[in-house]
């Protein structure tokens, strides 16, 4: 597993990198990879998205092939693109989504924030609102897209949409909940730690067969 921190990168550039790595991983010429990035302000619209959930078109909108509806990205939000070969991990996309939720719930707990799942919804929620959005896709059973964890971003961009297509959805962040500055670098480190730790419990099929 390779971890790549891309810093702040335009969405289109990060998407092109995902596509190239997905092809390489599917061909067996690159290792599974976790990309970490922050994006300049942009809205992304998933496969089940509806433009009526966009209330203001003053910011760039990109239509993409992940699941889910519309969401917002901006600096101060940690975006993760895990590129995993589910062909070696049971081809279970639902399990993969629950895995991502567990990673983010654990990372939030390290900052003193209690996150949880909501039945019938994908993502991480808190009593104060939705903390993280998750939307995934796969090509040749290699995952792309991933999660967006609100760390310390300006949340006003969410007021111009119905986040994830949910009317009245309140978005929050680790910084808003804790009421104090939250270090992006520290959150990043905790996400990586929990991602790698939990991934070790999700053995590829080839390894399971040898147990």
UniProtKB/Swiss-Prot annotation:
Question: Cellular component GO terms, alphabetically?
Answer: cytoplasm
Active site: which residues? 164 (acyl-thioester intermediate)
Gene Ontology biological-process entries: protein modification process
At the top of the EC hierarchy, this enzyme's class is transferase
Residue stretches making up the BPL/LPL catalytic domain: 28-203
Q: Does the keyword Transferase apply?
A: yes
Residues binding substrate are 66-73, 133-135, 146-148
Q: In which pathway is this protein known to take part?
A: Protein modification; protein lipoylation via endogenous pathway; protein N(6)-(lipoyl)lysine from octanoyl-[acyl-carrier-protein]: step 1/2
Q: According to its UniProt record, which reaction does this protein catalyse?
A: octanoyl-[ACP] + L-lysyl-[protein] = N(6)-octanoyl-L-lysyl-[protein] + holo-[ACP] + H(+)
Where are the residues marked Lowers pKa of active site Cys as a site?
A: 130
Pfam families listed in its UniProt record: LplA-B_cat
Task: State the compartments where it is located.
Answer: Cytoplasm
Q: Offer an example of a GO molecular function term for this protein.
A: lipoyl(octanoyl) transferase activity
Q: What is its EC number?
A: 2.3.1.181
Q: Which UniProt keywords apply?
A: Acyltransferase, Cytoplasm, Transferase
What more does the entry say?
In the reaction, the free carboxyl group of octanoic acid is attached via an amide linkage to the epsilon-amino group of a specific lysine residue of lipoyl domains of lipoate-dependent enzymes.
Tell me which family the UniProt entry assigns to this protein: Belongs to the LipB family.
Question: Tell me, what does this protein do in biology?
Answer: Catalyzes the transfer of endogenously produced octanoic acid from octanoyl-acyl-carrier-protein onto the lipoyl domains of lipoate-dependent enzymes. Lipoyl-ACP can also act as a substrate although octanoyl-ACP is likely to be the physiological substrate.
From the Swiss-Prot or TrEMBL record, give the protein name: Octanoyltransferase
């Amino acid at each position: 597993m390779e971890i790549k921190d891309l810093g702040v990168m335009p969405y289109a550039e990060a998407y092109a990198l995902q596509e190239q790595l997905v092809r390489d991983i599917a061909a067996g010429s690159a290792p599974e990879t976790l990309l970490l990035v922050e994006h300049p302000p942009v809205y992304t619209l998933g496969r089940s998205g509806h433009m009526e959930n966009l209330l203001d078109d003053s910011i760039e909108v990109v239509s993409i092939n992940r699941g889910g509806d519309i969401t917002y990205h901006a600096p101060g939000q940690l975006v993760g693109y895990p590129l995993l070969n589910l062909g070696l991990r049971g081809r279970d996309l639902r399990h993969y989504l629950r895995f991502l939720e567990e990673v983010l719930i654990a990372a939030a707990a390290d900052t003193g924030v209690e996150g949880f799942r909501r039945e019938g919804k994908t993502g991480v929620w808190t009593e104060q609102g939705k903390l993280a959005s998750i939307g995934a896709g796969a090509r040749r059973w290699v995952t792309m897209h991933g999660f967006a964890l609100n760390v310390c971003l300006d949340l006003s961009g969410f007021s111009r949409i119905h986040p994830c297509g949910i009317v009245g959805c309140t978005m929050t962040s680790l910084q808003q909940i804790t009421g104090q500055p939250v270090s992006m670098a520290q959150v990043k480190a905790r996400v990586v730690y929990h991602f790698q730790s939990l991934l070790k419990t999700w053995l590829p099929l080839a390894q399971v067969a040898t147990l």
